[in-house]
Structure formats: structure tokens, C-alpha cells
Amino acid sequence: MVAVASQISCSHCGAPLPVQPGEILITCSYCGFTSVVETGKAFEFEHSLILNTLPPAQVFDSIKGWMKNSFVAPKDLSKKSSLIEQNLVYLPFWVVSGEATSHYKGIFERISPPEEKEGDITNHYDWMVLARTQTDFPTRSYHLSLEGKIPFEATKIEKGAKVLNSEMSAEDAVEHARDEISNLHQYLAKDKVDKIVDIKTNFEVSETSYLHAPVWFLTYAYKDKRYQVLLDGAIGQVIKGDLPGEDFKLI
């Protein structure tokens, strides 16, 4: 059975709000009020916005600069590529802040004889979790600064931009962050020991907040093929992009 979008009314201003299947939070595009889809009640967490700084006319110029600086892109890519489509999307993120501490025990095998070793890894994190379930967005490659965030205002969203809603609860986001941080600390521990015998990680959450951040989704063409690029709308840097390879020629 195909899931069908529904519609509810904003509990703050009464505007009609289309709800896509799977969305559990919805932000009104008229007044900026965020509510829980199931109950219609007000959202209890801080909701922030990172502003887009790139006018539409400058987006492809930023991509061309990235092309010119690439060591693997064809030399004529910036001149011969053409823009097919670009869309500004405000992606929803949960920001899970807190301190994580791991205690590890392992075997250090880089000396002879090998010796047992243990230690601690402690770091503070503002861990970003994309609040969408069916996506392969490279969140760990997205180095977003939270310094420029402001309280969410619908009037700050550009006309034509799309604001995606959350498909993930705060509780699920915390568990997701906890799992990813545990995996990160296990990776860091492997730099200290060659074989991990035991590792335990404790993540103390101090704050959970909700955030929308601007990302340009762009498609360009080169030699009859299409390629995708994701561009950070806040600072104009490429998050991830596809590049065509150089044609191989015999000398």
C-alpha cells in the first residue's frame, strides 16, 4: 500500500499543513510554530535556524571554484559543465550535546613482548543527527558551526526553499548519537592499543535541541552525464560532490 500525505492545521495560526508519511514533527511555513504531529501540542525543545548566505546566482559559481581546485577533476570541467537544477533545502537535525567518557583495556602489540594497557577517552560533543530516516546524507562530512544559529523564524526562509520535517524523535536521536559516539571512541581506542579487550562508554547528555540548516542540492551536466553536489548554504563549501574522471589518453 502506498503511503498518502495528510493535512493538519497549525495549532498556533490555523494554517493548513501538509504532513508526509513518517513525519512526527511539523514546522508551520507561515508562522514558524513547530508542533508534534500526533498530538498537535507545542514542541518542547529549542528550535534554531542556520541562515543561508548564498544567493541563488552565486551557488554554481561556488561549485565551479570547487571544480577548479580539484586535483582529480577534468581541467575543462568548470568551463564546460552546465547547471541543470539547484534547490535550497533546510534539513532538520537533532543536536545532542554532552560529555562522553570511555574506559578501555587492550593489548599493545607494537612492542615485544606485548603488554596490557588501559586508559580513558573523554570528549564533549555537539553531535548532529539528521532527523530523516530514508536518506544517505553524509552527516559526518557536514562540519556545521553552531555559532551562527538563531531562533527559528519562518520569515527568514527564502521563497521557494523547502523545509523538511523531522521523522525522528528526540529519544531516538539521543540513542543514535550514543551509538555513533561509542563507535567513534572504539575507533579512537584502536589508536592506543592494537587489540581491544574491553571498552565501556558513558554518554551524559546535557542538552538536546532541534535545528534546521541550509543545504543546496545541485545537479550539473558534463559531456552528457549528470552529477550531484551538496553545498553548505551557510559557508559555501561543498559537503559532498560527484566529479567525472579524466579521459585516459595514450601519449
Q: Residue ranges of each PLM-predicted region?
A:
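Short cysteine-rich clusters marking metal-coordination/redox-active sites
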Residues: C10-C13, C28-C31
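Charged, low-complexity helical/coil segments in non-catalytic cytosolic or luminal regions
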Residues: E44-V229, G241-I251
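Short Cys/His-rich "knuckle" micro-motifs
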Residues: Q20-E23, E38-A42
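Cys/His-rich microdomains that often coordinate metals
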Residues: L17, S35
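Residues immediately within or flanking Cys/His clusters that coordinate Zn2+
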Residues: A5-Q7, L25
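A charge-rich, low-complexity, intrinsically flexible signal that marks solvent-exposed coils, linkers
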Residues: L231-G233
